[in-house]
Amino acid sequence: GYVGRGALDIQAVGDIFAAPSGQLVFEALQKADKGHGVLLLTLNYAGDQLAGKQAMKLAKKAGMNVRQVVTGEEIQFDPNGEDNQRGLAGAVALYHVAAAAARAGKTLDEVAEIAQKYADSMASVTVKVTDATHPQNGMSFGDLGETDLMEIGAGQHGEGGGVRVPMMSAKDTVATVAKALTAKLGMTSGDKAF
C-alpha cells in the first residue's frame, strides 16, 4: 500500500486491474478530510478518471474543499501517434512530494500546485517482455505470447498500446528508454534533473 507517514492518508482501491468506484473514492475523501481540505491524486486511466470526476462532483455537492492532481507521465510509444499518457510508477514519488508539502504546512492550493508541477515534470516508460496474467482467473493481458519481441510503452498492466521491437539486451533497452525519457523532459547531456 501507499498509506503511511510521509505518504497518503487514505487510498481507494478497486478490484485487481480495475479502478475503484466514484462512491468509494468519495468516501475515502470524506474520511481523509480533517478540515484543511483534501488533495485527490489520480492516475490518468479511464476508470480512475471516471471515478475521480464522480467523487469530485459528490465532494463539491457535500461542500468539501478538494483539489485534484492527475499524473500521466508515461511515454507511450504509440504507433498511431496518439498522445494518451497514462499514470505509472511516478505516482509513488508524487505521493511523497505532496505529503512532504502538506507536512511542511503548505495550504491545499500550494500542495496541489507543487504536486501538479512535479507530475508535469516527470516521465516514465514500461517495457514488457512477457504478458501479464490475472492472478484470479489466469487471463492474459496482451498477445506477445512466445515471440522474440518486447513492447515498449505497454502500460501499467501490460495492456498494450506501445511499439513492439525485437528483444534487446538490458543495456540496449536502457539506452532506448533513456533517450525517450530525456527527449520527453527536454534534457540534453550535462543537464541536471534536480
Question: How should these model regions be labeled?
Answer:
Residues 77-86, 95-162:
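Internal, active-site/partner-interface "lid" segment
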Residues 11-16, 60-84:
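Short, acidic/small-residue loops that bind anionic groups at enzyme active sites
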Residues 4-35, 182-184:
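Glycine-rich oxoanion-binding loops at beta->alpha junctions
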Residues 49-63:
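Short Gly/Thr/Asp-enriched flexible loops that form oxyanion-binding sites at enzyme active sites
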Residues 1, 43-52, 86-91:
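Gly/Ser/Thr-rich loops at beta-strand to alpha-helix junctions
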Residues 167-194:
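Gly/His-enriched, cation/cofactor- and phosphate-binding structural elements
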Residues 1-12, 76-77, 150-168:
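Gly-rich Lys/Arg/Thr-decorated short loops/hinges at beta-loop-alpha junctions or inter-strand turns
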